[in-house]
Amino acid sequence: MALTKHRRTLEAAAVVANLAFTFLYVNDSLWSYAFGILGPALLLALCIRERFYAEPLLQVVYILMTVYGWIHAQSSPWIASALWHVIAIPVCILVAVGAAYFLRRTAARYPLQDCLVTVFGIFATWLMMNQDPAWAWYFLFINALCVWMYYRRSLYLGTAMYVLYFAMALDQVAHLSIFSA
């Protein structure tokens, strides 16, 4: 599949903005929030163009969560209890499967995977913006799935971005401090 110049430019800009957000966020920079709005806005346009129909919702949520995080950046962290995760995981799976059932009737590419990324991404982003370190565990799963989806669509810059996101989430989980100061 030949890539158009517009598609490559949009993908590259989205990747740069999203990586800037993540790198700045894990390093506690308030500048991260500007990129946390720009990056998802660009990915939203790319996802619509590539017929990922659930993920644009995730990009809108990312923008809203970034605004929420910006407003609450100086607040104390909120840490979810283990019970939250025991409840949230099956609920996220059920919501994703239900949404995928309806998306199967559209031209959506990979509806179940798209919905899993979207639903778990919303929950993980909420954890992230509340400074709960459990966000990184969810993003290991989400980013691995995104690597597969983006690679299958020949979105190689996006694939590389999600590989790097996976590494950043692993860095957070393992406390390696490779990407953070």
Indicate where each model-derived feature is located:
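N-terminal membrane topogenic signal
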Residues: 1-13
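Intrinsic, low-complexity N-terminal interaction/targeting segments
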Residues: 7, 107-128, 132, 136
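Hydrophobic, membrane-inserted alpha-helices
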Residues: 14-21, 38-44, 118-125, 140-147
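Hydrophobic core of alpha-helical transmembrane segments in multi-pass integral membrane proteins
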Residues: 20, 85-103
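Short, hydrophobic transmembrane alpha-helix segments
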Residues: 23-31, 46-50
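Alpha-helical membrane segments and adjacent membrane-interface helices in multi-pass membrane proteins
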Residues: 37-73
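Cytoplasmic-side transmembrane-helix entry/capping segments in multi-pass membrane proteins
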Residues: 55-63, 82-87, 109-119
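Juxtamembrane boundary at the C-terminal end of a transmembrane helix
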Residues: 170-181
